[in-house]
Amino acid sequence: MEEKINNLIEERAPWLVKKNFISVVIFNFLKKLLRFDETIYAGDYIQNLSGAEAFNWLGNQYTNNCTIEGLENIPSDGSCLLVANHPMGAADAIALYSQLYKVRNDAFFFANELFVYLLGSFHNVMAPVVWNKEKETHSATKVTIERLNTFFNDQRPGIIFPSGRLSKLTLFGLWDRDWEKTPILLAKKNNFPLIPVHVEGKNSWFFYFASYTNKQLRDVSQLNELFNKRDKHISIKIGKPVKVSELSSNNDIAIQQLRYKVESLRKKGLFKINRFIYLRKFKKIT
């Protein structure tokens, strides 16, 4: 795992691994701030586990303070696709997977290239997906299609974050970026229900600072945004299943209708102005 992390840093932030004084000082500071040692330990530890064991261990260790509502909305058998917002990154997938495991122990989730690079050995629970079209290749797409065909033929539930990237911090809270139409296309092809899911949680101040100041630091800091969630509250709410036939036949409109259902699950409250803004925006489409 240490070699993978060093290679990732060299690729994403090459100036950090230079041998000049400033780079060395900053790198040593970031190693402590971003818990590199713990990342390496956890990565090495789970390599000897099965996919389910690994992600349940990560969930118990790092998303242990998670509450969930609506597990009864998950079908007891057959394929379905849980469609969620993406506020934190890896922590969203780990928290949702480990909670879903209580009622479905055969789930899988869509994982981006960073997640696959670090934890790519767990092929039985991950479907690799490249959200950045510039990085997409024919071979990568072929692997994804083959993996999905296997998972859905086995009647397994999936977890997807259609934004493909982490939510953006704004003055009105966390906003998901534009959603891909993938859930709608998959539901039409495979004829399974879509399950709206809202995840509430947030990343560290350093991550949001880096997001607005330095893309390279942001990429490096993502390594820490699972391991700093221990004892921090994460809330998950699962809505009722949605048939794709209940949505618009226009895929662009259908994905916005589905997003509205996810945003409707946001917690209500006096200061939840972001919920009001979201629903006002997407209500015009539904």
Question: Language-model segments: what does each one mean?
Answer:
Residues 1-80, 93-95, 104, 272-286:
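Membrane-anchoring hydrophobic helices of lipid-metabolizing enzymes
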Residues 5, 142-286:
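Non-catalytic C-terminal accessory region of glycerolipid acyltransferases
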Residues 56-60, 118, 226-229:
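Short, conserved catalytic or adaptor-binding loops enriched in Gly and charged residues
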